[in-house]
Amino acid sequence: MKLRFAAALPILVLVLAVSARATDITGQWTATFSTQVGEQHYTYTFKVDGEKLTGTAKSDNGTVAIENGTVKGDDVSFVENLDYQGQKLVITYVGKISGDEIKFTRDVGGAAKEDLVAKRVK
């Protein structure tokens, strides 16, 4: 009995380590979605290093570096600090990764919440 447990333990540890690892979303993702100010077209370029997420968010309003990005398992979050018509706007993203899609909810400066789906560019 002890021998079976000892043999199974390394396999269990490996399975847990792989499942807890951040999903690699490195690359380009696109999204088109409706907002209070019209249809938005985004290209996100992500780079994952461990649980740290960096990259850019490019929209019709310009390109900005994403900040405070994390990927933990299938959960992803980051902040986009956008200059919109001369006003600073903080947009906070929280999402769930599922294969080649990320379902995001973004909080636009506390004034609006918007749902969108970003798809991996292949």
Q: What spans do the regions from the language model cover?
A:
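Central antiparallel beta-sheet cores of small beta-barrel/beta-sandwich binding domains
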Residues: 23-122
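Bacterial N-terminal signal peptides
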Residues: 8-17
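Bacterial N-terminal signal peptides that target proteins for export
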Residues: 1-9
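Sec/Tat signal peptide C-region and signal peptidase I cleavage site
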Residues: 18-22
